[in-house]
């Protein structure tokens, strides 16, 4: 039993009224009188200590999923072709289930917006899996795309380019190191078109993205190249010095990170070629070479000869 004040017409003092959750009754603790019964408990039948637990244990189904065109609110007919007992359906019932699925898909995707979102969310999931993006980034990208649809920004533009732009914006917002070239290579749209859509989203949706930090790219590039933690640390220190000297302003963060890693790999005798680093970083060899020259000259870094 837990104490809970209840405003009822009774001589029982309010602070003496308790609620019996098991029986659904309000009782006066002084007299034992049942003041009100048959109370329906509209709360959950479980306990949760965090918002995440509360969402997972909701009795009304799974949590909303922004990466599904209808946010996962509709039901789905399973594709396993098995009945409720787990037995495989016979050929006749299998054909019936196939027809039901077709009609269900038609019912779920009726309007042009539904069709647009369904195609876009499939594209988002495909690119997200290829880039190994976490769910939080895909959710953020889905929200950005939905806002673009609501404002009519997709009309007259390819779904692929807007989805790619939304993914890039989400990566920037979540401080996940992914370049525009890296995302664009997995779409039919070219980089120029994706960049144009990205600028449109920032302008029309008022999406705020933090300034990219070259250090955000260091860990990922170094891991892909199999470099040590010492190389990562030195590369980060080089970037910090470059910031202090004003060398990072207006420069591509991925290119700066690539050059810093190249310098650090030489200093620690874990040599990688400029071509190898450029490919992993998603920049050109020329960019790595130019940033390398700037950093070594301006910061007076001496590279040991082989």
From Swiss-Prot:
Keywords: Repeat, Transcription, Transcription regulation. It comes from the Archaea. Pfam families: TFIIB, Zn_Ribbon_TF. The keyword Transcription applies. Belongs to the TFIIB family. Stabilizes TBP binding to an archaeal box-A promoter. Also responsible for recruiting RNA polymerase II to the pre-initiation complex (DNA-TBP-TFIIB). This is Transcription initiation factor IIB. It comes from Saccharolobus shibatae (strain ATCC 51178 / DSM 5389 / JCM 8931 / NBRC 15437 / B12) (Sulfolobus shibatae).
């Amino acid at each position: 039993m837990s104490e809970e004040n209840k405003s009822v017409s009774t001589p029982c003092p309010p602070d003496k009224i308790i609620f019996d959750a098991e029986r659904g009754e309000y009782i006066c603790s002084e007299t034992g009188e049942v003041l009100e019964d048959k109370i329906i408990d509209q709360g959950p039948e479980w306990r949760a200590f965090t918002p995440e637990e509360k969402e997972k244990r909701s009795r009304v189904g799974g949590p909303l999923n922004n990466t599904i065109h209808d946010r996962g609110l509709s039901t789905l007919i399973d594709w396993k072709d098995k009945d409720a007992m787990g037995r495989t359906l016979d050929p006749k019932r299998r054909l019936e289930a196939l027809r039901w699925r077709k009609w269900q898909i038609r019912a779920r995707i009726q309007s042009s917006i539904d069709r647009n979102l369904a195609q876009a969310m499939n594209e988002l999931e495909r690119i997200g899996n290829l880039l190994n993006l976490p769910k939080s980034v895909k959710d953020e990208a889905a929200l950005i795309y939905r806002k673009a649809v609501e404002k009519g920004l997709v009309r007259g533009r390819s779904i692929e380019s807007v989805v790619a732009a939304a993914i890039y914006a989400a990566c920037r917002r979540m401080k996940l190191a992914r370049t525009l070239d890296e995302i664009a290579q997995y779409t039919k749209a070219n980089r120029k078109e994706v960049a144009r859509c990205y600028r449109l989203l920032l302008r029309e949706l008022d999406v705020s993205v933090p300034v990219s930090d070259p250090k955000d790219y260091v860990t990922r590039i170094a891991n892909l190249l199999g470099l040590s933690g010492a190389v990562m640390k030195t590369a980060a220190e080089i970037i910090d010095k470059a910031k202090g000297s004003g060398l990072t302003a207006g420069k591509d963060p991925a290119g700066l990170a690539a050059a810093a890693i190249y310098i650090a790999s030489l200093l620690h005798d874990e040599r990688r070629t400029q071509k190898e680093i450029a490919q992993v970083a998603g920049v050109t060899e020329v960019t790595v070479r130019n940033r390398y020259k700037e950093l070594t000259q301006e910061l007076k870094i001496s590279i040991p000869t082989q």
